[in-house]
UniProtKB/Swiss-Prot annotation:
The gene is kdelr1-a. The record marks R5, E117 as: Interaction with the K-D-E-L motif on target proteins. Belongs to the ERD2 family. One of its GO terms (molecular function) is ER retention sequence binding. It comes from Xenopus laevis (African clawed frog). This is ER lumen protein-retaining receptor 1-A. The record marks D193 as: Important for recycling of cargo proteins with the sequence motif K-D-E-L from the Golgi to the endoplasmic reticulum. Keywords: Cytoplasmic vesicle, Endoplasmic reticulum, ER-Golgi transport, Golgi apparatus, Membrane, Protein transport, Receptor, Transmembrane, Transmembrane helix, Transport. The keyword Endoplasmic reticulum applies.
């Protein structure tokens, strides 16, 4: 495992725990898109269907368990534990416009036409756009809390570091996964505007807002 993947995993874990801690400490999920979190739960479920059949390392298995468990814990807190604080009026992105096309694309463009491979490919495609409901929600409300901004920034850094991970693997291992690279590029591009606003506003103590 190279340094970029490790740092990417650390950034991803940081994003997850920032979000969980924010919800639990404030006893509120205001400003958090339940739809994005539900999409992430679908992503990790589809990606790690091999959890009990394909053992690579303790680290790999542990990360899979953490991602799946934390995604469902987040969904549970939003839609059950702190449901009264969930802002469903602004969380209105039509997620079927993300799920259906990525599912179809996974059937058409994949590495191997087997159930596990199709589900894995679907998870890669869906993850690349899963943050859209959250960004859409921020644009509708006009601003995001600082802690929510930190969460989004950590997610964006995770995807950017994973792009460097793919470059590293191609350079030193000769490994090239076009599906993962293209999906990672799409996801990173979605964060570009947010990155700029994060640096120019949030780091200067101002609230972040996205154009409606």
């Amino acid at each position: 495992m190279n340094i970029f993947r490790f740092l990417g995993d650390i950034s991803h874990l940081s994003a997850i725990f920032i979000l969980l801690l924010k919800i639990w400490k404030s006893r509120s999920c205001a400003g958090i898109s339940g739809k994005s979190q539900l999409l992430f739960a679908i992503v990790f479920t589809a990606r790690y269907l091999d959890l009990f059949t394909n053992y690579i390392s303790f680290y790999n298995t542990s990360m899979k368990v953490v991602y799946v468990a934390s995604s469902y814990a987040t969904v549970w807190m939003i839609y059950s534990k702190f449901k009264a604080t969930y802002d469903g009026n602004h969380d209105t992105f039509r997620v079927e416009f993300l799920i259906v096309p990525t599912a179809i694309l996974a059937f058409l463009v994949n590495h191997d036409f087997t159930p596990l491979e199709i589900f894995w490919t679907f998870s890669i495609y869906l993850e690349s756009v899963a943050i859209l409901p959250q960004l859409f929600m921020v644009s509708k409300t006009g601003e995001a809390e600082t802690i929510t901004s930190h969460y989004l920034f950590a997610l964006g850094i995770y995807r950017t570091l994973y792009l460097f991970n793919w470059i590293w693997r191609y350079q030193f291992e000769g490994f090239f996964d076009l599906i993962a690279i293209v999906a990672g590029l799409v996801q990173t591009v979605l964060y570009c505007d947010f990155f700029y606003l994060y640096v120019t506003k949030v780091l200067k103590g101002k609230k972040l807002s996205l154009p409606a």
